[in-house]
Amino acid sequence: MDTTVDRDAAARDAAAREAASRMAAAAAAWLDALDPAQRAVATGGAPSADAESDAERRRWFYTPTDHGGLALGAQRPAQQRLAFRLVASGLSVAGYNTVATIIGLDNVLDLVEGWRVDWGRERGRDPGLYYLRVFGEPGGAAPWGWRFGGHHVSLNNLVVDGVVRATTPCFFGADPASSPLLGPAPLRPLAGAEDLARELVCSLDPGQAARAVLLDRAPSDIVGGNRSLLSDGDQVIHLRDIWRGQFADPGLLDLVTRMGDGAEQASGYDAADHQRVALSVSPKGLPVAGLDTGQRDLLRALLATYLGRVPDGLAPALDDAALDGVHLAWAGPTGLGEPHYYRLQGPRLLIEYDNTQRHANHAHSVWRDPAADFGYDVLGAHLAAHHL
């Protein structure tokens, strides 16, 4: 007789197969609609366990740079619809709505910046510059995957043996993090990820807070940056290095350098501070095993704002035992509108969030699996099982 664990595993496997089927159908339909020149830009080599040959698939960004692939603006409207169908296949309804809103925020940001920001292209803030690429043959016997990314969005999916096996790194950002709408409620795409974390930290007693709060000020960015592989001791990356290639225009290089330097100076961090919040194999902060029932409910709700980005059954199921392995770390004040950062880290889990730039109105959030981002683990196993 099947146990509950067996039934849950079977249900998750079925969900991952159904999602892979939807992805394959959507990817094939999009590729079939492209002309040869578009298709050449839209496709890449099949995923591989070899880091060198798989390097492009493992490259990701969250800055307004070329993320690799065919840009939305280089597609006809009917092709764009098919592209968004593929994007939606890898997201929950709430996840898709959030991504669509983030893309539209580039129009809002253009207004905030006075329509004058120049990134060396025709339009500095451009919702047409989100890029989609398919790696390998959708639905084929070999592993395949797809990536969608642009300013403040990065989605990375891998399918092996007809099953979705990786959905990380998964990055959502928002600039502005809060902007006015008609009526009393502002537009805040990442409100849940910020408000639930603040509520959780503010619920801690003095002893818990002393362990959770690493510093009274926040770093300028997420600590892991856009690294393909995370390592013990990783520290914040300078803004100019989170772009594809080097800036050919000295003026743009100077602009990005000054922006990064300004963010770093505003953080007030010195070398010891960076070391304090550096990534580590042993999680920093407060073990959540000691949280009370109400606090654990808050933590689960917070985790859902990350793990709920993808369709049901694709994110890891964190039972009580898995939850007990998570640590909560916070840096910065806890007041509304103040720069802050937090991290949730446990086995096969790293979540980072910061809202520090633009006077704490520019947020970054990322969900990662340090051991298996991009499907490192399953690609190696697939290679061993199917090749001499």
Language model features with spans:
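A cross-kingdom marker for long, charged
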Residues: D2-D8, D13-P36, A40-A74, R81-S92, ...
